[in-house]
Amino acid sequence: MEKRDFHVVADTGIHARPATLLVQTASKFNSDVNLEYKGKSVNLKSIMGVMSLGVGQGADVTISAEGADEADAINAIEETMKKEGLSE
């Protein structure tokens, strides 16, 4: 299992558009990918799950992946988060 912590810096947090991009990125991989915030974990391949967390600016989140391509999944998600200005 791979895990990585992120600090959300975007003014709007993880709202609909970046959430969609994160879900699309996670969905490219066979690994189980989860987003954890405030003790609640959701499937990062589910837009409804991601939106239900209400991740705002300044939030600390953990993304984990488990499976054959877990490292690639985490790296791709980190790249998406940085590219979209969600984290540094």
Curated annotation (Swiss-Prot):
UniProt subcellular location: Cytoplasm
Sequence ranges assigned to domain HPr in this UniProt record: 1-88
Keywords associated with the record: Cytoplasm, Phosphoprotein, Phosphotransferase system, Sugar transport, Transcription, Transcription regulation, Transport
UniProt cross-references to PROSITE patterns, sorted A to Z: PTS_HPR_DOM, PTS_HPR_HIS, PTS_HPR_SER
InterPro entries reported in the protein's UniProt record: HPr, HPr-like, HPr-like_sf, PTS_HPr_His_P_site, PTS_HPr_Ser_P_site
One cellular-component annotation, GO: cytoplasm
Phosphoserine PTM sites in chain numbering: S46
Pfam families the record matches: PTS-HPr
GO biological process, one term: phosphoenolpyruvate-dependent sugar phosphotransferase system
CDD domains recorded: PTS-HPr_like
Positions annotated as active site in the UniProt record: H15 (pros-phosphohistidine intermediate)
Regulation: Phosphorylation on Ser-46 inhibits the phosphoryl transfer from enzyme I to HPr.
Domain of life: Bacteria
Family note: Belongs to the HPr family.
Cited function: General (non sugar-specific) component of the phosphoenolpyruvate-dependent sugar phosphotransferase system (sugar PTS). This major carbohydrate active-transport system catalyzes the phosphorylation of incoming sugar substrates concomitantly with their translocation across the cell membrane. The phosphoryl group from phosphoenolpyruvate (PEP) is transferred to the phosphoryl carrier protein HPr by enzyme I. Phospho-HPr then transfers it to the PTS EIIA domain.
Name recorded for this polypeptide: Phosphocarrier protein HPr
Organism, as annotated: Latilactobacillus sakei
